[in-house]
């Protein structure tokens, strides 16, 4: 479903799986802190993050960078960061945490391909993992959580505790006036929270835009 949805497959947004996703987001919108939409922009987003630090919101979707991003922000007494994967939709199902990998490429016409392959293999060595960890980057190596420190131990150990990694993104498409992934899928959630848009209006907009996205895939 994930791959089909992110490639705008015809009819995908009218499936039971898609409806479940829409219903979950709409339900979350019902008890999202009402001040969130006004601060959901590139200038004020840290104020929404501050709601968690102040114990005014119990959770938020975010990334491991949040600790550094809010390092100097005030917080409630005894506050500690926590993290969990997205809960399974059904009991006994899989839970997921979204992630992505940086990529290294070797051009097919490269002169020193063997040396390049050796270097890429080095990127996953114990020594390289130590270097990456000092910069706050984590290599996709089994057991890496055992070598981490501080909050990163908790963040990345969720995969060792059974969470699966969800990877991928919306497929790119040729520019379409007035249509972007963010404005179609994500920004309307602010209107769900404020009550200015219904769940069905959101769905209808996604279906309409996806038809155009699919027709303009790169």
Where are these regions (language model features)?
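Periplasmic solute-binding protein
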Residues: 1-7, 98-107, 159-164, 180-190
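Glycine-centered hinge/linker elements that transmit conformational signals in sensory
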Residues: 7-40, 86
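Extracytoplasmic/periplasmic substrate-recognition and gating elements
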Residues: 30-33, 72-138, 187
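Short helix-initiation/N-cap motifs at beta->coil->alpha
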Residues: 37-53
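Beta->alpha turn/N-cap motifs
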Residues: 45, 62-70, 102
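Short, hydrophobic alpha-helical packing/hinge segments within bilobed ligand-binding/sensory domains
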Residues: 47-52, 66-69, 116, 129
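Alpha-to-beta junction loops
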Residues: 48, 53-62, 79
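Long, aromatic- and glycine/proline-rich binding clefts that accommodate carbohydrate-like moieties
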Residues: 84-85, 134-184, 191, 215-217
């Amino acid at each position: 479903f994930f791959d089909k949805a992110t490639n705008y497959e015809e009819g995908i947004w009218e499936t039971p799986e898609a409806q479940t996703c829409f219903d979950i987001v709409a339900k979350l919108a019902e008890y999202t802190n009402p001040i969130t939409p006004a601060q959901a922009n590139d200038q004020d987003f840290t104020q929404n993050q501050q709601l968690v630090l102040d114990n005014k919101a119990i959770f938020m979707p975010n990334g491991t960078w949040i600790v550094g991003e809010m390092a100097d922000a005030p917080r409630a007494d005894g506050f500690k960061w926590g993290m969990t994967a997205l809960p399974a939709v059904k009991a006994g199902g899989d839970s997921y945490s979204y992630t992505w990998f940086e990529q290294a490429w070797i051009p097919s016409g490269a002169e020193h391909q063997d040396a390049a392959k050796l270097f890429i293999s080095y990127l996953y060595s114990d020594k390289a993992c130590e270097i990456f960890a000092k910069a706050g980057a984590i290599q996709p190596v089994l057991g890496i959580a055992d070598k981490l420190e501080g909050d990163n131990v908790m963040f990345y150990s969720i995969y060792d505790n059974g969470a699966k990694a969800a990877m991928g993104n919306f497929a790119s498409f040729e520019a379409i006036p007035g249509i972007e992934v963010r404005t179609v899928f994500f920004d309307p959630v602010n209107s769900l929270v404020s009550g200015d848009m219904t769940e069905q209006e959101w769905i209808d907009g996604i279906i309409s835009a996806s038809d155009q996205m699919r027709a303009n895939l790169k």
